[in-house]
Each structure stands twice: as C-alpha cells, then as structure tokens.
Curated annotation (Swiss-Prot):
One of its GO terms (molecular function) is 3-beta-hydroxysteroid 3-dehydrogenase (NADP+) activity. This is 3-keto-steroid reductase ERG27. Pathway: Steroid metabolism; ergosterol biosynthesis. The gene is ERG27. Keywords: Endoplasmic reticulum, Lipid biosynthesis, Lipid droplet, Lipid metabolism, Membrane, NADP, Oxidoreductase, Steroid biosynthesis.
Length: 475
C-alpha cells in the first residue's frame, strides 16, 4: 500500500522539526471542530516562536466541505494576523501580517468514520503519502506533500442520532430540577434506535456482526484510525515529545447510560451518551494495569520493524467542550434562540459548563495540544477529564471534571482534599456537580478499572475481527 509519488517540498520544510506543529482534527468543517482550528491559530501564534509553522489537518466527509473549511481557516488566520496587537508588539515596526499568514497551513482530507475501509485507506495515504488538498483552491495549494509526523490528533467528529425533544417533559424537568441541571444533563432528548451500518448498502458490510452507526461514528472509527496512525504518532526516543490523542467526550457520559452487555448501544435510550461513556472509560484506563494486555496491543504498530524503531507510544487525553449551542442538539432552528438564552442564563447564575459558543468550547483540546509535555506529566493529565469552562465574566479556563465511578483524578478525595483545591470560583472541582453525585470510593475505582479492562478487550476484539472481515491487512 501507499503512494509512489515523489513528495514535493512543503512550506514548513524550511524550519526544523521543533518549529513545526501538526494537528489533525476530525469533523472540522463546522461547530466545535472548526473552532478548535480557529483557537489553535490564535493561541499558537500568540505563544510559539515567530519562526514556527502550524499545520492544521481538518478532516471532512466531502471535497466541497474541505474546500469550505480551508477557506474558513485561511480567512480566520488572515484576520488574526491583521488585527493581533500582541503579534505586532512582539515583532515591532517591521511586522508584516503576510509573514504570519505564511506560517499557518491548512491541508484538508476526507474521511467518513463509519466507512472502515475508507478509514484504513485514509490512514494509509497519510502515513505513506504524499497527500494533497482538493482541486479548486486559490492561494497556497498543498499538493503531494508528506506529513512527517502527527503531534496531536483531536477526535472531535460525532453523530448524535436524536429525533427531537420531548417538550412537555422538558418543561416539567426544568420546573422540578431547575434550569442549570436540566440543560446540563437533559433527560428529555429523544434518541432514534441506533442504525446498523450493515443495513446501509453504501458501506457494503456483511450482515453480521452488527456495527452501530452512533458507536462507530463516535468511538470505533476513531479507535481504528488512531491505531492506523501510530507510525506518525509513535516516537523513537524519550527525548522526543510524544504524540497526543485527544478524545472529545461529553458531560452526559454518566454511569447509567452504558450497559456492557449492549456495548454498542443498540437497545439503550441514549446511544450517543453510551458511546461517550465508553470514550471516558477507554481514555482514563489506558495505562492502568488491568487494561494493559489490550491497550499495549492497540498502541503497538502492526509493522514489527516500525514497532522496534518507534517504541514510545502516544499519550491519550480526555476532554469535553462543556455545553455549547450546537446543531448536534435536536432543537429546530426557530427554537435555537431559546436554547441559547437558557445556556446564557445558566452561566450568569453560576454554572461553569455553559460556554454557549463553540470557540469557548474548544478551549480544553487546544490547551492539551499546546501544553508542554512536562506540564501535562506533572498534572498526571491522562487520568483527568478536562472540560472547557467559563464564568459569567467570560473568563475561560480548563476545569477538572467529575466522572462517575472515577472521581476527578481516579482517587478518593475527602473533604480536606477538596477544600485544598487551589482553583477559584466556578473553576473549583466541586462547583457544577451533577445533582445527587456521590463521592467516589476505592471500590468504585476498582470497578471502573475492571470496566476499563473489559472495554479495551472489547475494542481490540472488534478491531481484529473487522480487520479480518474487511481483509485490509497484508498476510
């Protein structure tokens, strides 16, 4: 597999590797995904050296969406370069916004995460290259360029699978549980039964084993993609910054939504929330002893020579955007104003999670992507679910998020430990808890680790099973 084309010289080849940052974002043509790209541009330009290059690789499901995304991110970079007082002050009177724009590159490729054959082909093209932007661009056209590595991959793409809102129930829940709780953990969304991708002719899957649409779009497609991208994510030595896999989860990934006997959520009332619970469990337990027999296989490249040459595995992190006014939520456009108002009011009265707009919601994955590795290691950041959070004054921070059965950091914390939290105001751990939340116990954490081991085994079994079904690996 792989292309035989000779790679062209890329614009970022003019600087050393430490002055390059390669970030792939799935589902990046709108919403949170597009905002992650925008926020990366802002924070990268504000914090990195004036020689450094940012290479954004937003994925979409069509060439037309890729062209729109490239244009949107280029326009955003141009505006940022022209209006940034911080950049002008860093450079001085010799500042030219054109020089700044020339350090931001957008290469958009297409992948449908429900099309597993397409996922394998996408990863193969990116790993072996070269790759190109779709035809039809003005300005910089990246053609036949090679991606030497990936520094960060953000798993943002998702599919909700909702049919609408039960409005009488919504009114009742708001009246009985209060506005903040009811718009943070809404129990009135109506989910469609998750579709079997096997029944969709365009994917050409066999009738069995079943493959759930929501589960594959949210979890399994990303899981397969991550493994296939290991040649770009693994490193040769500890002196190199490891690659980062960043999952985008949800506040709604609560314990009761996942039934391990219905792992793909075919029978549950909330397949999206169930898939996000699986995401939480996988990410938080990836390095725990019980999960290692399966997770070590996942983090090892298939090519033995590649595995020997690059033994340093990528790190896995967990984030969520808080609550934003997204088209993913099943509200008709003519009711969206009311939904946005409810989110605003919730933030005004003290909720840390109602960020309202997608740019604010993009804070946590961008923060993970741009932090020094030593800072993340000191925080033991792989054991924490990092949420995008804001207060009524629109101060935006990352906030540790409670996970049912795990707590905030995978350890028991008594009142004294929680009182020692140095965060201020709504950014403190205990602000914004779900009503009825109980403090985690040692027994809970043991059970969570067991769920992790079972989930990792399930995912690895699925990955190998579908590799064999599709025949995508060389003998």
């Amino acid at each position: 597999m792989g292309s035989q084309l000779i790679p062209a010289t890329a614009p970022w080849d003019s600087v050393p590797a430490q002055e390059q940052l390669f970030v792939l974002i799935t589902g990046a043509n709108s919403g949170i995904g597009l905002s992650i790209g925008e926020r990366l541009i802002d924070e990268f330009l504000a914090t990195r050296s004036l020689r450094s290059h940012l290479i954004l690789i937003p994925t979409t499901r069509s060439k037309s969406k890729s062209l729109q995304t490239i244009k949107a991110l280029r326009d955003y970079a141009r505006k940022a370069a022209q209006t940034s007082q911080a950049l002008q002050s860093r450079v001085g009177s010799s500042y030219r916004w054109q020089d700044t724009v020339a350090r931001v590159h957008v290469l958009s490729l297409q992948v449908d995460l429900c099309d597993l054959r397409g996922v394998y082909a996408f990863a193969d093209a990116l790993v072996h290259g070269p790759v190109s932007n779709p035809e039809g661009l003005e300005g910089e056209y990246l053609k036949n360029v090679r991606i030497p590595r990936l520094d960060t991959v953000v798993f943002n793409a998702a599919y909700g699978g909702w049919s609408g809102v039960n409005y009488p129930k919504a009114i009742w829940v708001i009246l009985t549980e209060g506005l903040v709780q009811s718009v943070t953990w809404p129990s009135y969304k109506m989910a469609l039964p998750t579709a079997r991708l096997n029944d969709k002719a365009n994917y050409d899957y066999p009738k069995e084993p079943p493959l759930g649409e929501v589960f594959t779009a949210c979890v399994f497609g990303h899981y397969v993609l991550a493994h296939e991208l290991l040649p770009l994510l693994c490193r040769q030595s500890e002196t190199e910054t490891p690659g980062r896999l960043i999952w985008s989860s949800s506040l709604e990934a609560i314990e009761r939504v996942l039934d391990m006997s219905d792992f793909q959520g075919f029978k549950c009332d909330g397949p999206y929330e169930s898939a996000k619970r699986v995401t939480d469990i996988l990410s938080l337990t990836a390095t725990l002893p019980a999960s290692l027999p399966s997770s070590n296989r996942f983090f090892t490249p298939d090519d033995p020579a590649e595995a020997r040459a690059k033994p340093i595995r990528p790190r896995m992190y967990l984030t969520h955007p808080g609550i934003v006014a997204s088209t993913l939520f099943p509200v008709p456009w003519f009711f969206m104003w009311a939904y946005e108002l409810a989110l605003l009011i919730s933030r005004w009265i003290g909720s840390p999670w109602h960020n309202t707009d997608s740019y604010t919601g993009a804070k946590s994955p961008v923060w993970i992507a741009l932090q020094e590795q030593s800072a993340l290691d000191e925080l033991d950041a792989e054991r924490i679910k990092w949420g995008s959070s804001s207060n009524r004054h629109m101060q935006v921070e990352v906030k540790k998020t409670e996970v049912e059965g795990w707590g905030w950091e995978g350890k028991v914390e008594d009142a004294a430990a929680l009182n020692a939290d140095t965060a201020v105001g709504v950014f403190k751990k205990t602000v914004g808890r779900k009503r009825g939340a109980v403090d985690v116990t040692k027994e809970d954490i043991v059970k969570f680790e067991e769920l992790g081991a079972e989930s990792w085994k399930n995912m690895e079994d699925m990955r190998h099973e579908w590799e064999n079904i599709l025949g995508v690996k060389k003998a």
